[in-house]
Amino acid sequence: MLLLPSAADGRGTAITHALTSASTLCQVEPVGRWFEAFVKRRNRNASASFQELEDKKELSEESEDEELQLEEFPMLKTLDPKDWKNQDHYAVLGLGHVRYKATQRQIKAAHKAMVLKHHPDKRKAAGEPIKEGDNDYFTCITKAYEMLSDPVKRRAFNSVDPTFDNSVPSKSEAKDNFFEVFTPVFERNSRWSNKKNVPKLGDMNSSFEDVDIFYSFWYNFDSWREFSYLDEEEKEKAECRDERRWIEKQNRATRAQRKKEEMNRIRTLVDNAYSCDPRIKKFKEEEKAKKEAEKKAKAEAKRKEQEAKEKQRQAELEAARLAKEKEEEEVRQQALLAKKEKDIQKKAIKKERQKLRNSCKTWNHFSDNEAERVKMMEEVEKLCDRLELASLQCLNETLTSCTKEVGKAALEKQIEEINEQIRKEKEEAEARMRQASKNTEKSTGGGGNGSKNWSEDDLQLLIKAVNLFPAGTNSRWEVIANYMNIHSSSGVKRTAKDVIGKAKSLQKLDPHQKDDINKKAFDKFKKEHGVVPQADNATPSERFEGPYTDFTPWTTEEQKLLEQALKTYPVNTPERWEKIAEAVPGRTKKDCMKRYKELVEMVKAKKAAQEQVLNASRAKK
C-alpha cells in the first residue's frame, strides 16, 4: 500500500473542496470490426483463437482465388446449348485443371470472369454475331454454373466425371512393379469414399496391422458415387403423376445396375491388388514359419513330456519289479522255511512210524497167531497213515515205557478209534450219495417215458452228441435226440424234451456222481478190451519196436494245422498224407488219416440228423 509522506515541520495541511456536476446517461451503439468479430464468436460459440484461424483460412482462400488462373476452353463457342448435358462443365468455366477440387468461391469467381468476357451484350457491343435466345453458347456457361453451384447436382456430375480413369490394372501388369501400378489407382479411387481418412497402400515396410486395415477398408468400401446424372428420362418432363412414377422407377433400376457394376469394379481392383501384393505373400510365409515353429515347439514339448512320463513309468516299473522281487524273495524264504519244517515233520513222522513198527515187531505184533499177526500188521500200517505226529509220539512213549499187555491195550484202543473214524466218514459219504441220487431222481422225474431208463451207454452217447452239436446248431436238441435214436443200442426212443432234461441233470450232478459215472465208463472199457494180467514176480522186460497207437486227444492248434494242411495239399497231390503229417508236428500219417475219417463221420452224422429233423418239420407242416 502506497502512503504519502507526512507534512514537513512548520507546514500545515491544506484541505481543498471541489464541486462536480451530476452524472448523465447516454446511449452508445457498438460498431466496428472488433464488435463484429465478437458477435460472430458469440453466435458460433467459438473462442477468439478459433475465429482468428477462420479468418486466416478465409484470407488464404481469397488469396488462392486471386491467384487462380482460368484456362481458356477453345471449343466453348462451338458447343451446342441443347446438348449441354454432355459438356464438360469444369472446362466451360475454365476450371478444367482444378475440377472436383475447386471451391465454391472459385466456381463463383470463374463464372463471374466468364460472364464478363462472354456475355451477349458485351459481345454485341464489340460487333460479334449473337444468336437469339437459348441458342447462344452463353447458355452453356449458365448451365455449367447451375450444375456446379448446386452441391447435389455437382456431386452427380463428379460421379460421372469424363476425365476419371475407371480402368483396373491386371495381375500381369503389376507382377514386377506392384506399388508403382496400384498406388495411383487407389489414390484416385479414394475420392469416392464417404470416409475421409482413407488408408494408404504403403510399401514393403508396412506392418501387418497397416496392411490388414488397408484391405479391410477397401473390401468394405463405402462409396458415395451415384449415377443420377446419366438418367435418360427427366421426371420434370412428365405430363402426369403416373408417368413421373414410371420414369423414377426406370431411373432407380438403371442407377442400381450402374452402382452394382461400380462396386464390382472396386472389388476386382482390390482382389487383383491382394493377389499381387508381395507383402501378403511375405506375411503368409511368416505365418507359415510361425506355425511350423509352434508345431515344432509343441512336438518338442510333447516329446519331452512323453520322455518324462516314460522315465517315470520305467521308474515305477523298476520300483514294482524290486518290490516284487523282494516279495518273491520273502515268499521263497517263507516257503523254504515251511519246507524245512515240513521235512523235519516228515522225518519225525517217518521216525515215529518206524519206531511204532519196530515196537510192534519187538512184541511180535502182540499175537502168536499168524492170521492175527497179519491183521495187526495191517492195523499198524493204518495207524501209521492216519495218526498225527503227536499221537504217534504219545503212542510210542506208551509202548516203550509199559508192559506188553498195557501196550497191546493202548494199541487196540487207538486202532478202535481210527476204525470208528473211518466208519463215520464212510457213512457220511454214503449219505451224500443217497441224497444226490434223490435230487437226481427229482430233477429228472418229468423228463418223459424215456428219462427213467438211461444206461451208461446212453449217457456216454448223450455227452458225445452234445459235444458234436454245439450251441448255435439249428434245432439243436431235436438233432441230438435224432442222433441218439439212430446210434443208441438200447432201442429207447428219446425226444428233445427227454434230452434237455437229462442234459440239465448231468450239469447239476454232484462231483461224486460224475466220478462214479466216469468210473463206470472206465470199468466198461476194461471189460471190453480186457486187462493184461500182471506176473507175481516182475522181471525186466525187453522192448520191441512195433506199431504205436497214440490215444492223445487232438488239441485245437493241431486241428487247425490239420485243416490247413488238407487245404494246402489236395487229393491229387503225390504222397499227400506224408506231407500232411509233416505239417502237423507230433502226429503220424496214421493219426492224420484216422482223424480225417472221424471228422468225415461226424460231419455225415451231423448232416443226417439235421436232414431228418428238417424232413420231420416239413411233414408236420
Swiss-Prot record:
J domain mapped to chain residues: 88-161
UniProt GO molecular function: ATPase activator activity; chromatin binding; histone binding; Hsp70 protein binding; ribosome binding; RNA binding; ubiquitin-modified histone reader activity
One GO BP: positive regulation of DNA-templated transcription
Places the protein is found: Nucleus; Cytoplasm, Cytosol
Residues modified as Phosphoserine: 47, 49, 60, 63
Free-text comment on this protein's domains from its UniProt entry: The ZRF1-UBD region specifically recognizes and binds H2AK119ub. The ZRF1-UBD region is also involved in protein-protein interactions with other proteins, suggesting that it may be masked by some regulator, thereby preventing its association with H2AK119ub.
Subunit (UniProt): Component of ribosome-associated complex (RAC), a heterodimer composed of Hsp70/DnaK-type chaperone HSPA14 and Hsp40/DnaJ-type chaperone DNAJC2. Interacts (via ZRF1-UBD region) with ID1.
Additional comment: Constitutes a myeloid leukemia-associated antigen and might be a target for leukemia T-cell therapy.
Protein name according to UniProt: DnaJ homolog subfamily C member 2
